[in-house]
Each structure stands twice: as structure tokens, then as C-alpha cells.
């Protein structure tokens, strides 16, 4: 993931996924390995879109992960556009609907949206796709380095 998305000292990753899920591994270790900052959300904050906006703004989060159903809930917040620090929004765990991808790109114009896929048994993520405005679908993508 570092080769593909290049975190650096100016980045902040929000660790918000419960530790029982595979994504929490990269949320926790990736920023530490790359010299970026790690912001840790309080338990349950990932379920409250308004609070999540506050946390993203408070810590100037640049990178975070959502399963698409949680991204849909987050997009329900009228305050999403205030998350101007976001540079990377990563989705995995469920199919990412094209409509949701387009809504996210429109409301967070400073952020890239990535769809990742990978069976937990083999690795956390093995393929990736960069979503683009106007895409009619969201494939699982190509192998990630």
C-alpha cells in the first residue's frame, strides 16, 4: 500500500475500525511504518457521521477507510464537505456502488477514492482501483504492490 499510495510525515491516518477486523491492521501499522501520524478514534465514533467529521477536522486526517455501507452513512452528514484535509478515502469489505463513488468524489473533491479487494485469508487487500468522476462502475481493480 505504501508503494501505491505513499503516506509521508504530512499525513494522518484515522484508526477507527474495531480491532477484530482486518483493516484495523493497516490503519494502525501503515502510518507508523511510513512516518505519518496516527489518530485513534474513540470506540463507537465510527458509527456517528457528525462526530466522525469533528474527529477528521480535529486531527486533520488525510487517510481513512470505510466499508461502503459506512461511507453511505457518512455521506448522510451535511458536514462532509468540511473534511477538507482528506486526501485518501479507501473502501473495501463490500461492493462499492458507482453512485456512492460518484457522490463521494463530488462532495470531497480534494480526496482520491480507492476501492480495494482482498480475501482476509490471503491478505488484507490484494487488488485496488482508483475511482474517477464519471465512472459507470467500480471494479475490484488490479494487483496492488
Model-derived segments and their meaning:
Residues 1-145:
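Motif- and composition-driven signal specific to adenylation
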